[in-house]
């Protein structure tokens, strides 16, 4: 597998005011898609700002194994010379995606539209995650699962369709990964492939497909949904991609600055796609001092600079329809809620149960061992904020990078130090997290 068995425990202690300017790593969602669409395009794709975390590196290796030329040309700068839609070569060995659910699931869609057979594998965490809802629509399009672990889990061998069929598919849950897998498979199908979602999920795939030259139409569907129609068999052309800073990674220094009194930090070039800014909306509702400036738009994705200052937060109710726009940020939001005055209710968090760990239970455990009163009712998380957190707990990270970072953020403002059992997996999304937080003034040792 991609990751070592060595653990790296770490402790976060109450810190003086955080200050300084930082750029968090490139957005993970955009980085995966840039590599995959670059591999499916004809000609050269030049990527700047790529996240060089292990998850994205594993996706790059997989694209190389499928026949694309993927090269690092400088810091965060990469080029991909693609093979064209349906042009993937038969890989010689299983494709190992490490801890990356996004890379694995999107690549399944791309492979489903190519006349090849590929085996998908990953680490113990990825092997435990559900793949059935990804492959169900792909099988409707003509792909076939030849072999998989119990319950449709990895390792899974997928035979791509020789003649893929366009379908109209209604996603069972709001999921950018399901939608993206169907659209990527639909590139190889003649006619129009349509995805209908009751709740709009992240639209990075749609924006980037258009950037690479695909014909795609998005229409509203019902109160909160979308209908996406892709015309198949385009010739995607290599493109220039500027990867904005990842808002899911920016969430950690952002919340830390709100919680540590007197803090004043600036985060630059953070993506502000409205389907990714649920956390910022929520933190502002809680009373967080977050100012936005210097907005710009490169290669289809908006970005801005944020100034964040220490704030007294209050409890709020977070509606379930906000979940798709901040599904990865609930862990660190729960930390903010623990320091707020009053109760915060986060509704409709079922999707947290099928992430790198059962994040709903893991979040509750992280708070409880540090003296916070928390309750799970169905798919709702209820946190009783008291304005401070006792701390002093040891947090089990369950091989989950976001649990590790959330717990360390909590320790920077808690009464007593907070320790995490392992920080090794932080490298999957935010390799520079610990050094960056130290540069801003965080006490991590």
Curated annotation (Swiss-Prot):
Pathway stated in the Swiss-Prot or TrEMBL entry: Metabolic intermediate biosynthesis; chorismate biosynthesis; chorismate from D-erythrose 4-phosphate and phosphoenolpyruvate: step 6/7
Segments carrying the region annotation (Disordered) are 1-25
Q: Which domain of life is it from?
A: Bacteria
Residues binding 3-phosphoshikimate, per UniProt: 28-29, 33, 175, 177, 328, 355
Q: Which residues bind phosphoenolpyruvate?
A: 28, 101, 129, 177, 359, 402
Annotated Gene Ontology cellular component terms: cytoplasm
User: Where in the cell?
Assistant: Cytoplasm
InterPro entries the record matches:
Enolpyruvate_Tfrase_dom (IPR001986), Enolpyruvate_Tfrase_sf (IPR036968), EPSP_synthase (IPR006264), EPSP_synthase_CS (IPR023193), RNA3'P_cycl/enolpyr_Trfase_a/b (IPR013792)
Q: Which family does it belong to?
A: Belongs to the EPSP synthase family.
How does this chain assemble?
Monomer.
Record's protein name: 3-phosphoshikimate 1-carboxyvinyltransferase
């Amino acid at each position: 597998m991609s990751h070592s068995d060595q653990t790296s425990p770490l402790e976060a202690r109450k810190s003086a005011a955080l200050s300084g300017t930082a750029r968090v790593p490139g957005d993970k969602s955009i980085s995966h898609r840039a590599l995959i669409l670059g591999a499916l395009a004809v000609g050269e794709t030049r990527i700047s700002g790529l996240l060089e975390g292990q998850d994205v590196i594993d996706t790059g290796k997989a694209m190389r194994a499928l026949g694309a030329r993927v090269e690092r040309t400088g810091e965060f700068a990469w080029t991909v010379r693609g093979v064209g839609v349906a042009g993937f070569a038969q890989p010689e060995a299983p494709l190992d995606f490490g801890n990356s659910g996004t890379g694995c699931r999107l690549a399944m869609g791309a492979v489903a539209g190519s006349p090849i057979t590929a085996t998908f594998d990953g680490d113990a965490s990825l092997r435990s995650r559900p793949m059935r809802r990804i492959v169900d629509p792909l099988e409707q399009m003509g792909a076939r699962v030849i072999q998989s672990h119990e319950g449709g889990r990895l390792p899974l061998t997928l035979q791509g369709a020789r003649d893929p069929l366009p379908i109209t598919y209604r996603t069972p849950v709001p999921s950018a990964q399901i939608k993206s897998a169907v659209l990527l498979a639909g590139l190889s199908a003649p006619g129009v492939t349509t995805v209908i979602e009751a709740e709009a999920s992240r639209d990075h795939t749609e924006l980037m497909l258009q950037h690479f030259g695909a014909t795609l139409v998005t229409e509203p569907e019902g109160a909160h949904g979308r209908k996406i129609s892709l015309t198949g068999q385009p010739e995607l052309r290599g493109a220039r991609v500027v990867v904005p800073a990842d808002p899911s990674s920016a969430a950690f220094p952002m919340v830390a600055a709100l919680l540590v009194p007197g803090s004043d930090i600036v985060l630059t070039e953070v993506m502000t796609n409205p389907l990714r800014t649920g956390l910022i909306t929520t933190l502002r509702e809680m009373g967080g001092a977050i100012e936005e400036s210097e907005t710009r738009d490169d290669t289809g994705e908006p970005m801005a600079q944020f100034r964040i200052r220490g704030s007294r937060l209050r409890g709020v109710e977070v509606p379930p329809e906000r979940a798709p726009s901040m599904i990865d940020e609930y862990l660190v939001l729960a930390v903010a809620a623990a320091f707020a005055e009053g109760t915060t209710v986060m509704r409709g968090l079922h999707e947290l149960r099928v992430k790198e760990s059962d994040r709903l239970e893991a979040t509750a455990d992280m708070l409880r061992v540090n003296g916070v009163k928390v309750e799970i009712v169905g798919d709702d998380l209820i946190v009783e904020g008291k304005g401070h957190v006792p701390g002093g707990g040891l947090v089990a990270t369950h091989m989950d990078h976001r649990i590790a970072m959330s717990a360390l953020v909590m320790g920077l403002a808690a009464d007593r130090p907070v320790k995490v059992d392992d920080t090794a997996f932080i490298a999957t999304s935010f390799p520079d997290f610990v050094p960056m937080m130290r540069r801003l003034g965080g006490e991590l040792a």
